[in-house]
Regions:
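Intrinsically disordered/low-complexity terminal segments and short unstructured peptides
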Residues: 2-4, 29, 42, 164, ...
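Concave beta-strand-loop units of leucine-rich repeat
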Residues: 25-31, 54-58, 81-85, 108-112, ...
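Charged low-complexity stretches with an acidic bias
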Residues: 65-85
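Glutamate identity and glutamate-enriched acidic tracts
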Residues: 8, 20-26, 35-38, 50, ...
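Solenoidal tandem-repeat scaffolds enriched in leucines and small polar residues
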Residues: 104-186, 190-191, 196
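N-terminal segments that cap or nucleate solenoid repeat domains
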Residues: 1-58
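Leucine-rich repeat
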Residues: 6-15, 17-23, 34-42, 45-51, 61-69, 71-78, 88-96, 98-105, ...
Length: 223
């Protein structure tokens, strides 16, 4: 239940963190928690926010559900949810969000998201304008990456961060053949279970030819 006290508090936080032009709501590190997000979406305020940063706010799946079922951020273009604990249960509600069709950046790093949650994201067909996808430090494994490689909705991706996501050579092999991800310029595969074969698959790719930055450090690939 959202009390008057909670609404008063969250309105003060919003006033402090909303940019002058109303485009950005920077709540990074405010630790508002699930109840804070519930209060946020329960205000009667109409937001024209394009940039929403909820990183480091002790959010769980409950907070994610409040956000994804809200109707107040329809103009959102960039969403930062890093360093929380929304988990598979939370991210599975993402397809319900009303702002997905305009979203260009989705940062999910450090959220205890596994294979099921990863699949929920890559199977979402509304993310056609997404250019930056950050899965960093979530153990999603190969299956979501393999699905992403053929997911036509993600054809506009420019940056894909798979740092320490339990990715293996199996996923990289399919990724290197992806016709969907031909626009990717920045690919981070560092700290995964990759061997020399992984590097060779990427070196011989005929589709990922626009990559300008490729990170593969701290893997099993030698010098």
């Amino acid at each position: 239940m959202v009390t008057a006290t909670k609404l008063e508090y969250i309105n003060r936080v919003i006033d402090d963190c909303l940019s002058e032009d109303g485009d950005a709501l920077e709540l990074n590190g405010k630790f508002i928690g699930d109840e804070g997000v519930e209060a946020l979406v329960s205000t009667n305020r109409n937001f024209d926010v394009e940039n929403l940063d909820l990183s480091k706010n002790k959010l769980t799946w409950r907070g994610a559900h409040h956000l994804f079922h809200s109707q107040q951020f329809k103009n959102l273009k960039r969403l930062y949810l890093g360093d929380n604990n929304i988990s598979d249960k939370g991210v599975k509600a993402l397809p319900n969000a009303n702002f997905l069709e305009n979203l260009s950046l989705l940062d999910l790093r450090y959220n205890n998201i596994g294979e099921d949650g990863g699949m929920a994201v890559v199977q979402c067909e509304k993310l056609r304008k997404l250019q930056i996808l950050i899965f960093q430090e979530n153990p999603i494994g190969d299956k979501p990456v393999i699905a992403l490689a053929t997911a036509k909705a993600f054809a506009n991706l420019r940056k894909l961060n798979l740092y320490r996501t339990d990715l293996s050579v199996k996923g990289v092999k399919i990724l290197a053949k992806s016709k969907v991800l031909q626009r990717v310029k920045n690919l981070n595969l560092a700290r995964n279970y990759l061997n020399l074969d992984s590097a060779q698959y990427l070196a011989k790719t005929k589709t990922l030819v626009n990559i300008e930055t490729l990170l593969m450090f701290d893997t099993q690939i030698g010098d």
